[in-house]
Design a protein with these regions (language model features):
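N-terminal secretory signal peptides that target proteins for export/translocation
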Residues: 1-5
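Sec-dependent N-terminal signal peptides
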Residues: 6-18
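Sec-dependent signal peptide cleavage junction
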Residues: 19-31
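N-terminal non-catalytic regions of secreted/periplasmic and cell-surface proteins
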Residues: 29-66, 158
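N-terminal cap/lid segment of alpha/beta-hydrolase-fold proteins
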Residues: 42-44, 145-158
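Extracytoplasmic/surface-exposed domains of secreted proteins
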Residues: 49-67, 103-150
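Short, surface-exposed alpha-helix to beta-strand junction/turn motifs within ectodomains of secreted
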Residues: 52, 56-98
Length: 158
C-alpha cells in the first residue's frame, strides 16, 4: 500500500510541476516592439497624431522625447503617372511633442503641423487627393528601463 501511495504522490508532483511550468509567462526584454499608428480627421484630411509602442510582457520606464526618433516616409509612387507632381509625398523625421509610459506601452505624440502627419497627397492634375503609402521607422536612441509585471528589475533594453 505504501508503494502505491509513493507512486501516486510522485505522479501528482510530476503533473503539478509540468502544469506549473506550462503556466509560467517568460519574462525577457523585448527584441521586437509592435507599433500602431493613430490618426484623426482634421480639416485638411486624416493626420497621424500618435504612435503606440507595445513592449509585450515587460513594463517600460525612463523614456522621454529624446528616447526615440521617428522617421516618416509617405509616397504615391506607383499610384500616379511618373510625370505628375504630388504634393504630400514626404521623407522626414516627425516632431515628438510628448511621450507617455503606460505600463507595457509607450505612447508617442507628434506635432500634427510638422508637415509629415498627412495620409493624403494632392495631385495637381485632376485636383484630387489620393492615399499615400506610409512607412514609419522608429529608432531607439537611449536605453529604456524594463521590469517584469511583478516589478522585478530586468535592467535596460537597448
Amino acid at each position: 500500500m505504501m508503494k502505491i501511495m509513493k507512486k501516486a504522490f510522485a505522479m501528482f508532483v510530476a503533473v503539478f510541476t509540468l502544469l506549473a511550468t506550462l503556466c509560467m509567462v517568460p519574462v525577457s526584454a523585448a527584441g521586437t516592439v509592435v507599433a500602431q499608428l493613430y490618426g484623426r480627421i482634421e480639416d485638411n484630411g486624416q493626420a497621424i497624431y500618435k504612435m503606440v509602442l507595445d513592449y509585450g510582457n515587460v513594463k517600460v520606464s525612463g523614456v522621454d522625447k529624446d528616447t526615440y526618433t521617428v522617421h516618416a516616409k509617405t509616397s504615391t509612387e506607383g499610384k500616379r503617372p511618373a510625370d505628375e507632381t504630388a504634393y504630400g509625398d514626404k521623407d522626414q523625421d516627425r516632431t515628438i511633442v510628448r511621450v507617455e509610459e503606460k505600463g507595457t506601452k509607450v505612447e508617442i505624440y507628434f506635432d500634427e503641423n510638422d508637415g509629415a502627419a498627412g495620409t493624403l497627397s494632392y495631385l495637381a492634375t485632376g485636383a484630387r487627393n489620393i492615399p499615400v503609402d506610409i512607412e514609419y521607422t522608429v529608432t531607439q536612441n537611449t536605453p529604456v528601463k524594463v521590469s517584469a509585471m511583478d516589478g522585478t528589475d530586468l535592467g535596460e533594453d537597448t
